[in-house]
From Swiss-Prot:
Glycans are attached at N47, N173. This is Sclerostin domain-containing protein 1. Coiled coil: none annotated. It comes from Homo sapiens. GO terms for molecular function: BMP binding; BMP receptor activity. Residues 75-170 form the CTCK domain. It holds the Pfam family Sclerostin. GO terms for cellular component: extracellular space. Residues 174-206 are annotated as: Disordered.
Length: 206
């Protein structure tokens, strides 16, 4: 048995130890629960995020569908097969070439376009006559002709291999139609003739 005086000193020490133990337990629980992540309240997702998920993460802006944006235009190429003749001789094999006389349309409207659909209504609002299908690339090809007497002839001809669309303004269109009605230009008087005329006028005045 311990004397009462020692019990008097041990009691506060026991209380201090008890408080430290409780503090240690509290610290442990705080550390334990500090790693728990609080659930984030669910916010309604916007339409843009849904569109990005459906479209595979691609961003589509409204500027891509603007009516004022430039559209790439292409030719609907026409392919022809014909024989070449000079009146007496005719080509042995037919000649295949491109004829750049088709209609100029936006690339998404062309039949060989792989991309998605494009509104033809938008294109119909624009003046399709501003664009013309013209020759883009050509190459020289030799072709052999068979004559009626059995002889052969070889000619070099230019074959169109690619077409392109060229834009013409209204001035070009008007000039192409009205070039015949233009009045002939006045003959230009040279500087020497003017000097001679001025000298002759001076002599006549004197």
């Amino acid at each position: 048995m311990l004397p009462p005086a020692i019990h008097f000193y041990l009691l506060p020490l026991a209380c201090i130890l008890m408080k430290s133990c409780l503090a240690f337990k509290n610290d442990a629980t705080e550390i334990l629960y500090s790693h728990v992540v609080k659930p984030v309240p669910a916010h309604p997702s916007s339409n843009s995020t849904l569109n990005q998920a459906r479209n595979g993460g691609r961003h589509f802006s409204n500027t891509g569908l603007d009516r004022n944006t430039r559209v790439q235009v292409g030719c609907r190429e026409l392919r022809s097969t014909k024989y070449i003749s000079d009146g007496q001789c005719t080509s042995i094999s037919p000649l295949k070439e491109l004829v750049c006389a088709g209609e100029c349309l936006p690339l998404p409207v062309l039949p060989n376009w792989i991309g998605g659909g494009y509104g033809t209504k938008y294109w119909s609002r624009r003046s399709s006559q501003e664009w013309r299908c013209v020759n883009d690339k050509t190459r020289t090809q030799r072709i052999q002709l068979q004559c009626q007497d059995g002889s052969t002839r070889t000619y070099k001809i230019t074959v169109v291999t690619a077409c392109k669309c060229k834009r013409y303004t209204r001035q070009h269109n008007e000039s192409s139609h009205n070039f015949e009605s233009m009045s002939p230009a006045k003959p230009v008087q040279h500087h020497r003739e003017r000097k001679r005329a001025s000298k002759s006028s001076k002599h006549s005045m004197s």
